[in-house]
Amino acid sequence: MTSSAPQQGDSSRVRDLRIAIVHSFYSSATPSGENQAVADQMAALDRAGLKPHLVAAHTDRLSRSPLYPLRAAVTVGSGRGHSPEADLRRLRPDVVHVHNLFPNFGSAWLSNWDGPIIATVHNYRPLCAAATLYRKGATCTLCPDGDRWAGLRNGCYRQSRTATAPLAWAGRHGAPANPLLRRADRIVVLSEASRQTYVRAGIEPGRLVLVPNFTSDAASPKGVGSGRRHDRVDAPWVFAGRLTPEKGLMELLVRWPASERLDVVGDGPLLEDCRRAAPRAVRFLGAVQYSELRERLPSWRGLVFPSRCPEGAPLIYPEALAAGLPVLAFPGSAVADSVREQGTGMVVGWHEPLDAALSRAADHFHSLRPHCRSVFLRHYTERIWVNRIANVYSDALAHHAAVREVPSGGGPRVPEMEPRW
């Protein structure tokens, strides 16, 4: 399964906890679903009365220093450098929830921290320098399979061996030795595919907890799911995401029928290549404001999701469902798995005639809109997420207390597992 059934947890059990959220924010020059997810989760925890406190590092600010590339490389490679520990000592939280340390926070502080830690893995960075498990048009698992220096040889991070070197060095012992994953009492994954990937890489299954992303229903236009027709016969399809190789847009465009309209929302290094490959019926809208995208989602015929890599759980999927928008996905991603399992659209193979697939999708996507809304309400609302994460916090506290009762000679110890693929 790609999304767990809603848990009827009671967030009041942990309402008096002080929760510290640790996150290294990626550059605002590149729209980040992970940054958005952290902001949404902070707001949701606050509304639920769970007292979250953000401990953050911002690439936008730190990168102004001419020495930033060197400092970031040393931090990533050695685990030493900028640390959230002083802020955490001041806050004295009951639970620390880490979303991202890369590249601005070190990891050395983890061995000094005595309280419960939860880690959310938004991508595959502990297994792959590029964080995508994707290379040269296909899924790549060379590094987690045991060839630890494959990423360095291929310059997988930013197409540069120099930039990849700190990541390769930090990950040379595999995922079980990753300081954050080794230390965490509970590790939150966003999809069943992600959970299975981390288990195969050697992470203890009992510490992995599936908590899918949510999205706020407040951002959905009024009337969505009411039965009122939002899609027109001539409405275009939409792609929304970064224009990078692993997103699959180039492969989609060379197959896209000239008679079908497609709007491309997003920007990235492949923009000009995509423009050259696109038929005339494709419009490039560029990056749009988050609120505008949410407002416009119901007006498209369907979301096209051609990702070529095993993405964890992009926010665009629950956002589409909140808008009552069905999804046309291609195999290989967690979104395709969810579409199959939840019946929220159609999965089409790369070798199938795309014009025929689009015609079939157009015939029944309108009737799927109420169902997509229903799936959103059952699996991806803020309330459901808060209950799930409250259960995780409660379990982490209990686990940490149990571990501390057992003499360990120096803090929590997690059984190591050999990677099995």
Q: What are these model-predicted stretches?
A:
Residues H366-W385, N391:
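A short, well-ordered alpha-helix in the C-terminal region of glycosyltransferases
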